[in-house]
């Protein structure tokens, strides 16, 4: 299973910053209904207000595995202030990063090899899709379900990928270009 996953998935970082508590007036202006948002960029950004009234802004601003956390926070704070100029003077007090498993087809996969059941490749949607796919595997194991549509998704790899993602700097520049022209 480890060999399979290693040849079909790249591990990347995603980053988050969180602001100080915002005034109720500013909260209502930024997100009147308190919803979660995603943009449509290749280097996607996502944001929402936290239950205690802070702005949470996250994204993958490059494909590096060694971006400094402070540098990432600086990039993200510029991005959020571009989208929300009202946050120009807002202080961002928290930042962190986490690992993502991204498959070449950008789809999660489940399956079984030699009696070992697996699921991987959530690509940044881990909490919701992992819960769902865990339930799928549980139903398959208990016999309550015969097949899952996720088992039907063909596993993809690239002939040039041997666990060394040497191509990612080129892909990052390409995605940055696509974001720039759109």
Give the positions of each predicted feature.
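Short, surface-exposed charged micro-motifs
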Residues: 1, 46, 109
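Active-site beta-strand termini and strand-to-loop segments that position acidic
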Residues: 19, 49-50, 111-113
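C-terminal catalytic lobe of FAD-dependent flavoproteins
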Residues: 62-180
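Small-molecule pocket liners
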Residues: 13-15, 45
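Single conserved hydrophobic/aromatic residue that forms the stacking wall/gate
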Residues: 1-6, 10-11
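Conserved FAD-binding catalytic core of PHBH/FMO-like flavoproteins
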Residues: 22-55
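Short Gly/Pro-enriched turn/cap motifs at secondary-structure boundaries
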Residues: 7-8, 35-39, 98-100
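Short beta-strands and strand-loop turn motifs
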Residues: 57-60
């Amino acid at each position: 299973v480890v060999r399979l996953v290693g040849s079909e998935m790249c591990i990347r970082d995603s980053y988050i910053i969180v602001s100080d508590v915002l005034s109720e007036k500013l909260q209502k202006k930024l997100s009147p209904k308190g919803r979660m948002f995603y943009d449509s960029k290749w280097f996607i950004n996502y944001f929402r207000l936290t239950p205690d009234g802070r702005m949470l802004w996250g994204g993958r601003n490059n494909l590096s595995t060694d971006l400094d956390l402070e540098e990432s926070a600086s990039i993200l704070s510029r991005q959020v202030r571009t989208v929300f100029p009202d946050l120009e003077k807002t202080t961002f007090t928290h930042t962190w990063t986490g690992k993502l498993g991204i498959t070449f087809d950008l789809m999660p996969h489940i399956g079984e090899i030699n009696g070992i059941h697996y699921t991987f490749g959530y690509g940044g949607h881990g909490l919701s899709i992992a819960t769902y796919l865990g339930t799928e595997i549980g139903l398959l194991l208990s016999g309550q379900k015969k097949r899952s549509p996720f088992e039907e998704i063909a596993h993809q790899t690239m002939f040039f990928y041997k666990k060394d993602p040497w191509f990612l700097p080129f892909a990052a520049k390409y995605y940055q270009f696509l974001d720039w022209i759109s």
